[in-house]
UniProtKB/Swiss-Prot annotation:
Protein name: Secretin
A GO BP annotation: positive regulation of lipid catabolic process
Coiled-coil stretches noted in the UniProt entry, renumbered to this chain: none
Purpose of the protein: Hormone involved in different processes, such as regulation of the pH of the duodenal content, food intake and water homeostasis. Exerts its biological effects by binding to secretin receptor (SCTR), a G-protein coupled receptor expressed in the basolateral domain of several cells. Acts as a key gastrointestinal hormone by regulating the pH of the duodenal content.
Valine amide found at: 27
Subcellular location: Secreted
Molecular-function GO term, any one: digestive hormone activity
Keyword set includes Heme: no
Membrane-spanning intervals of the chain: none
Annotated GO CC locations: extracellular region
Secreted listed as a keyword: yes
Family statement: Belongs to the glucagon family.
Amino acid sequence: HSDGTFTSELSRLRESARLQRLLQGLV
């Protein structure tokens, strides 16, 4: 099955969450 797309999706989610946390820390 598509394992690569899943990992890429997961990494993107993690990155977006980290960005949100960074933005919250800036505010």
